[in-house]
Design a protein with these regions (language model features):
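Cysteine-centered loop/knuckle micro-motif
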Residues: 18-20, 153-156
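Short, low-complexity N-terminal intrinsically disordered segments enriched in polar/charged residues
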Residues: 1-39
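Short Cys/His-rich zinc-binding micro-motifs
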Residues: 4-14, 138-149
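Internal alpha/beta loop-helix hairpins
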Residues: 29-62
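Short beta-strand edge/turn micro-motifs at domain boundaries
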Residues: 111-137
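Long C-terminal interaction/binding lobes of large macromolecular proteins
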Residues: 94-96, 107, 123-127, 142
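Short solvent-exposed beta->alpha transition segments
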Residues: 54-83
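Surface-exposed, charged secondary-structure patches
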Residues: 73-109
């Protein structure tokens, strides 16, 4: 299936080709912190570690290696993104979100209030405050927590 027919991984209900893919291909730049947050989430889902690393603030790029980002993206299955709030002014912005993913047999939620800055006329992720959320251990015959109403073994089981 080509990206032209896929819904975007960022849960925007738009086609990937019209939503985050142009950012990943660098044919467009995110105009808001929320667009960048969605593009980062989708980049993890498609294992585009270079985009994720390049979207960090310059001061944070060295501590976030492409290989570590790729390793994390490869062992996880990203399920959905919920943006709760976002805003920005000329040079700073924020996005409050919940990202859901599977890591092995755990259903995980990353709840974060992310901070963004503008560098060289581009939005970049600076850092964020993470709200701890307990992971859920999922058994093969449990209903998948992604909301599909299928058994986990028939849905997201690796």
């Amino acid at each position: 299936m080509t990206s032209n027919a896929l819904l975007c991984f960022c849960s925007s209900q738009q086609l990937y080709a019209d939503c985050c893919e142009p950012f990943h291909l660098k044919t467009k730049q995110p105009q808001t912190p929320e667009q960048l947050m969605r593009a980062r989430y989708s980049a993890y889902a498609v294992k585009n570690a270079v985009f994720v690393r390049d979207s960090y603030a310059k001061e944070k790029q060295a501590e976030n290696s492409i290989s570590e980002i790729k390793d994390f993206a490869t062992i996880c299955c990203f399920v959905n993104l919920t943006v709760l709030d976002s805003g920005y002014d000329e040079d700073t912005g924020f996005v409050k979100f919940k990202a859901h993913y599977f890591y092995q047999d755990l259903y995980c939620e990353l709840a974060e209030h992310s901070k963004f800055i503008k560098e060289d006329e581009q939005w970049r992720y600076l850092d964020g405050e993470i709200t701890p959320v307990a992971d859920i251990k999922v058994k093969r015959n449990d209903t998948c927590p992604c909301g599909s109403n299928k058994k986990y073994k028939k849905c997201h089981s690796v």
